[in-house]
């Protein structure tokens, strides 16, 4: 027998071979609800990052980072003798993947360490930045996460180059594997944009920099960027620096910039400040053709040890570096904060040129060589700019802001510091999550602030009395449950926004959302506000209950009442301490993105979408940080409690609505029922008695998926079993409480 024949794996290893996804590419991604489990986390179960960070010597760490900025290493020498610009780019590209549409992306979980981000064409050379940081990360260990360290290093870099930053907050916990829920687009080639736009760049077969072939740029992409994406091409953080699809058109580039930055929650002033501030520092790298650059880290060899983009041009580093394919240095002070950027932008006329790598860029006409070389003090260069820089001059709105910043450097510095803080903290959620001595005192509207608790809180006896009053008010179980759910389920685990705290369900825009049934909502809130006013007026010692707390307590009361009707005595946990935000504390435009276009928990969809309803349900559950069992038990419970929008009977598989029973599962899995679609759209289905043809139930895709999908059916079978009624009630209460408290970071 040969050695090859003896091998038990026959060249195959665990996890390879044809997968379920290969056979059924449209299979529902229930697995997204089990990512980032404790099984991938090497830290002890008792480890608490917030506690560890509180014991961190933050000032000592910052001193070490300051020292690193000018400690140039031979294996990756610092441009201009200062690593600051490289670390600013690292932090920017960590935070800059955030998009407001679904709150995903950003720097909050240290995902730049993993694929695909660690190998994106736009992140060339950031593997070197993280390796430069490793000795410091190694020194401080788990007291500082990679997620926090990358952002903090960007802050320290700015400070070391003369900018007064707005502040820094820690609190970003690392994850230990790539995010699977993030939708980066459907393109299969780097730098492609032909799926996210109805017409866009087809991308390139091999792209180790952001350079796009000129023949791809003759027909710029359309303006219909797919939601929730913010980047214009696969593998870019924002926009193509050469212009749309490599077309060097500053006006067209401005349109891309405005769309992309708006999708990151930035207005025009913040956009100008960020671009100009970032480009005050450092340079781009395009010393030679991109053909000299090797494979990205994820495609690298073992001996590369996670390094990618091996450069065979010259020394492969320093003056020979190839990153983007562009070769631009914007200012005479590339390692020092200044107003040079605007002085150059408006002080010169610009002509189109090519970098040594062949990328479109702009050079100042008839200008002297005044720009320092990054590695040779005896050399100077003419000023250069990117197409995206000229957009700030030739777009009228951007130009007005840029000229104001040129005339008022103090406004520019403040605007950049604030925009940088927003960029690097936008995905952290409320200030209650902020840690450290450098947290700024100023409260900002984009942080979705809520007032501090300034009164005594209700106790268990008060809560019990209030629940009795609520149940006697004439409000139905269905209305109480649906209102509490509408308030709490706006939460997004992606950027920690939304939730019941603040009672913003009574404010614009939430009070007008279709899913919240404005007319019904107004009646429920009016009744609860009367109960709140009566209770608060009767108290002494300053005790009060907020409407935010009362909405949740009312939902709890309804759940307890429904459980009692099913024969189970339960007390739903309740933690007072929510407060009521004002309309002035609520950015209507910012909150508009939280509106549910579909909520399968309430059997709601604003319209029919290309994405199947059951996939939107998984997306909603993932944003709510739910597991597959939690998703299942909540849908089953909410159906029998009557929480559907518009009092729809779809999925209400029970003869006793308002009773917290497992009827949804028992009846869905009843083999006496045969299901058929009511139309070719297959959105609504009828369940008829197999023998008589009598109509028994109607349901939607988000109902029938619990009998169709093998994973969800396995869970549904547990709750449909004869011995599951008590377990169902207790599991529903636990999952309900989790959702009601998702935004209660103060409880941690």
Curated annotation (Swiss-Prot):
The record's account of how the chain is modified after translation: Formation of the three residue Trp-Tyr-Met cross-link is important for the catalase, but not the peroxidase activity of the enzyme.
Group of enzyme by EC: oxidoreductase
Pfam families for this protein: peroxidase
Sites of the Tryptophyl-tyrosyl-methioninium (Tyr-Met) (with W-92) crosslink: 238-264
UniProt cross-link Tryptophyl-tyrosyl-methioninium (Trp-Tyr) (with M-264), position: 92-238
GO molecular function: catalase activity; heme binding; metal ion binding
Keywords: Heme, Hydrogen peroxide, Iron, Metal-binding, Oxidoreductase, Peroxidase
Reactions it catalyzes: H2O2 + AH2 = A + 2 H2O; 2 H2O2 = O2 + 2 H2O
Active site annotation, chain numbering: 93 (proton acceptor)
NCBIfam families the UniProt entry points to: cat_per_HPI, PRK15061.1
PANTHER family in alphabetical order: CATALASE-PEROXIDASE, HYDROPEROXIDASE I, BIFUNCTIONAL CATALASE-PEROXIDASE
Physiological role: Bifunctional enzyme with both catalase and broad-spectrum peroxidase activity.
UniProt subunit comment: Homodimer or homotetramer.
Protein name: Catalase-peroxidase
Natural source organism: Xanthomonas axonopodis pv. citri (strain 306)
